[in-house]
Amino acid sequence: MRTSQYLLATLKEAPKNCKAISHQLMLRAGLIRQVSSGLYTWLPTGLRVLRKIENIIREEMSKIGAIEIAMPIVQPARLWKKSGRWTGYGTELLRFKNRNNQEFVLGPTHEEMVSEIICKETMLYKQFPLIVYQIHTKYRDEARPRSGVIRAREFIMKDGYSFHINQKSLQNTYNNMYQTYHTIFNRIGLNFCVVQAEPGKIGGALSHEFQAYSENGEDSIAVPMIPDNNLIDFQLSNDVIPIKIQPKTAVETMQLIAAPNIRSVEELINQFNLPIHQFVKTIIVRAKNKHINNDYSLLGLVIRADHQISLKKIAMIPQIHIPLSCIEPEEIQKITGAQPNLLGPINLSIPLIIDYNVAKMNDFVAGSNMSGKYFFGVNWNRDILFSKVADLHEVLHHNSYTNKKNILSIHNCIEIGHIFQLGQKYLNLHTNYSQKNNEHKHNLSMEMGCYGIGITRIIAVIIEQNYDKNGILWPDVIAPFKLAIIPIDMYRSVNVRNIAEKIYTQLLSVIGIDILIDDRKEYPGTMFADIDLIGIPHILIISDRSLANQEVEYKYRKKNKIEKIKLEMLIRYLIEKIVSS
């Protein structure tokens, strides 16, 4: 491809209202242009990246026997009314009527439609399991689109659906899809983790989210501090799983309220008529390390008021002195000047370790470390920051876990994929399925799974994880072009022009890769800046100066280091560099 025939569409500066670095670079590098709030046109450079990601997904889906289909984005309202999501999905579901006054929706997802399609087909039990998927445009009427394509109204998803004759078959496909998602995201070059999640508006019994690390992420994940291990398998390592931290939106303003006669949490609960789980308590313990004077330093442990500290879990935290040693009330008064029941995490002059259940709370009540006063309406990030989260509380229900790698670190993340076990939630909506099930001699009891990947969002996430001051640093496998050729002053130098054209033609025929030759009449600085900005990983620079020594210059974008390559060795060198990457 020649830049003279290409819509490069680069910008020197991003619009001032763009806050996310991915949004800025996608606009500056000419990947997208905004049409309206939450709506974007994909320009040629962005579309090339998009198609490469889609093809990787198609390759991996094909390996597990998934079949591609295409369903309409416009769906009849009757399907959504039957499932209950016509009202249950909320205002993000865009509803409209056609000229015949019939109701429709723009589909944010396709569970209702695909389940009806499969249930209408006359299929034998031997044809199951069946996996279908599509790569298609979706629409979600976001109240406040933001961060470019990370939170857009229109987006492209891979949504897959599987159908099974029993739960065991569903579990097998679920496990295969789980591993396939690992493969896809690893091939793309993402740094991510997996968390067990709530099914949300889609529903079902079991679901897992794939979360990519990003400073601009809207989700918070507490991840066990395990070096070089960003991939946690929920089956093989149930004791070491990331935890999704989702503090609820703050409703109240923090207030300091006097309660001079209160001497316990129970009295506070009774006076203010609030549930006990809305209160936190702070316990000061001795740390493992000592001061110069041989006294132990101190730590504050913060848990819900209705929870107890787990001695078993505490023993796994290396910062805490074992056996556990809580300080006496007299020492607490020396530190805070207040009674133990008034201890709280705000303005406490010692390090804190916070139970992950507390990290998810909003508008909670805590001691103020001041005599006779409590903070009401406390919220994380607004009123107090947390840096260290751990699993501290005693297990009181059967499905909790003990995390052997107990200290957790908090990361902002963006959801890039989600898989669900739906069971029979959508299949039971269809009368013909129920009739077939009752009449079938094999007593078919179909189960359903669904599996999504946010493709357009992934591009933004990759940029969030791969950029420098000059632009995007694409992983080779999804770069819009593998190689850029920059001929310096090619319109003044016949030699430069001829060599550049010869190399371009040879590489196209020998290697067959995507190449962009910059044949514009531009200053070299502009050409270098544009190629770096759009993130082409391999760059050839051809000039009279280098050709005088029968050489060209090669730069690998991520290392930004120039190498001189002899012309006779160039093709072999590039094959080794590019094809093997």
Curated annotation (Swiss-Prot):
Signal peptide positions on this chain: none
One Gene Ontology molecular-function label: aminoacyl-tRNA deacylase activity
Compartments where located: Cytoplasm
GO cellular component, one term: cytosol
Family from the record: Belongs to the class-II aminoacyl-tRNA synthetase family. ProS type 1 subfamily.
Domain notes: Consists of three domains: the N-terminal catalytic domain, the editing domain and the C-terminal anticodon-binding domain.
Protein's recorded name: Proline--tRNA ligase
